[in-house]
Regions:
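Domain-level signal for Mg2+-assisted phosphodiester chemistry and nucleotide/NA-binding surfaces
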Residues: 1-84, 94-97, 124, 129
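Nuclease catalytic cores that cleave nucleic-acid phosphodiester bonds
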Residues: 58-171, 175-176
Length: 177
């Protein structure tokens, strides 16, 4: 694809509680926070970031996290009354006409209908989740799936790995629309 410039606007919507629980269950308590400086460039792959929103249940939200997302990615943290499912779904629906791609960082099968709806609106939908904590139906419905790795977390003692984008148990895939 030499000489071809792909210009896409991407919104990344993170279900913070789901991802934090998944990372902690998979890698331990010291690795439950996302290292955004590693993960976001891996997801974007030279595409433009339109929005980055971290949805988090409750009022105990780190001001350092909010400041970091705002200063480095012009992102924000949205506190949620209960689960992030409904606020994230509403925001994704609102953004559908403004972006080319929406990345949902969650393994929760509750987002399957949202993925189907966004795709019917012509939006490319990608899922980013921890491999053993993602619903297979969510992977199947998405246009693309990113495995969140230990190297995408703070506290990771492993050397930084390159992108591994695949379904659990399969070779690399990138569905075409």
């Amino acid at each position: 694809m030499e000489g071809i410039q792909i210009s896409q606007n991407v919104a990344i919507l993170i279900d913070g509680n789901n991802i934090e629980r998944s990372l902690e269950a998979e890698y331990g308590a010291e690795s439950r926070m996302i290292n955004f400086e590693v993960l976001i460039p891996r997801i974007l792959r030279q595409r433009g970031l339109n929005r980055l929103i971290y949805f988090r249940e409750g009022q105990n939200i780190s001001s350092r996290l909010a400041e970091k997302l705002h200063s480095e990615f012009h992102g924000s943290v949205r506190p949620c009354h209960k689960s992030a499912d409904i606020p994230l779904s509403i925001k994704a629906t609102q953004l559908a006409s403004k972006v080319d791609t929406i990345v949902i960082a969650s393994g929760d099968s509750d987002y399957v209908e949202l993925v189907r709806h966004l795709k019917s609106e012509g939006v490319r939908v990608e899922i980013c989740a921890v491999e053993n904590h993602v619903a297979q139906v969510l992977i199947d419905e998405a246009d693309y799936y990113y495995t969140m790795q230990k190297s995408d977390c703070f506290g990771a003692n492993l050397p930084q790995q390159r992108s591994v984008n695949r379904r659990p148990g399969t070779q690399s895939r990138n569905k075409k629309r």
